[in-house]
């Protein structure tokens, strides 16, 4: 039973950064030409980096939310670049602030069709209501993620706190579905038999 196995790609990492100091956003907005700051509409200052392509929401309290990173290395580089930018423009921020990943979103492909009707009966913490949403919602307990599974084999994984969590969750899901006999992998143009038929 050879198959391509699962693949995935990280689409977005959301992280919070605690700079540990209060910031003068008005002053920063004046000094940083690329900053967007309109306190009547939004209380934070918005900075967009191009390399890596990341957006940062910076708040007066010294908290920062970074979105758009595709991997943890890009996130680290972006935080370093943002800290340098803030320091260069008068903010007294630490060089190595506390960074915490809040959510990683990844899209993937199991490279096999999934029998969602059967999968929902066999997986714990799964919900499938096709008249409301075409995917099965699976809450995996370890790692703690939520995976949307579609009949085509496409998946979306959310809630991971590290790249390792994503890799573990995707492989674990694939193995579980394979063991349950609800994956249909095309091999030589023919669909593999259902697990029940192999018994």
Swiss-Prot record:
User: Where would one find the signal peptide in this protein?
Assistant: none
Q: Where are the sequence repeats?
A: 10-86, 101-177
Does the keyword field hold Membrane?
no
CDD domains given for it?
TBP_archaea
Looking up SUPFAM superfamilies in the UniProt record yields:
TATA-box binding protein-like
What GO biological process term is on the record, naming one?
DNA-templated transcription initiation
Q: Which Gene Ontology molecular function entries are recorded, alphabetically?
A: DNA binding; DNA-binding transcription factor activity; general transcription initiation factor activity
Q: Which family is this sequence assigned to?
A: Belongs to the TBP family.
User: Tell me, what does this protein do in biology?
Assistant: General factor that plays a role in the activation of archaeal genes transcribed by RNA polymerase. Binds specifically to the TATA box promoter element which lies close to the position of transcription initiation.
PANTHER family in the record: TATA-BOX BINDING PROTEIN
Q: What is this protein called?
A: TATA-box-binding protein
Instruction: State the species of origin.
Output: Pyrobaculum aerophilum (strain ATCC 51768 / DSM 7523 / JCM 9630 / CIP 104966 / NBRC 100827 / IM2)
Q: Which gene encodes it?
A: tbp
């Amino acid at each position: 039973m050879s198959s391509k196995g699962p693949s995935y790609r990280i689409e977005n990492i959301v992280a919070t950064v605690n700079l540990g100091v209060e910031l003068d956003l008005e002053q920063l907005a004046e000094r940083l030409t690329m900053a967007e700051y309109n306190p009547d509409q939004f209380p934070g200052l918005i900075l967009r980096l191009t390399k890596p392509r990341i957006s940062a929401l910076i708040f007066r309290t010294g908290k920062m939310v970074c979105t758009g990173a595709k991997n943890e290395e890009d996130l680290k580089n972006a935080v370093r670049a943002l800290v340098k930018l803030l320091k260069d423009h008068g903010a007294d921020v630490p060089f190595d602030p506390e960074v915490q990943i809040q959510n990683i979103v990844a899209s993937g492909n199991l490279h096999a069709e999934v029998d969602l009707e059967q999968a929902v009966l066999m997986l714990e913490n799964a919900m499938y209501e096709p008249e409301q949403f075409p995917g099965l919602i699976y809450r995996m307990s370890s790692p703690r993620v939520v995976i949307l599974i579609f009949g085509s084999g496409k998946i979306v994984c959310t809630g991971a706190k590290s790249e390792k969590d994503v890799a573990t969750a995707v492989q674990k899901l694939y193995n579980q579905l394979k063991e349950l006999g609800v994956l249909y992998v095309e091999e030589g143009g023919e669909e593999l038999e259902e697990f029940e038929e192999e018994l």
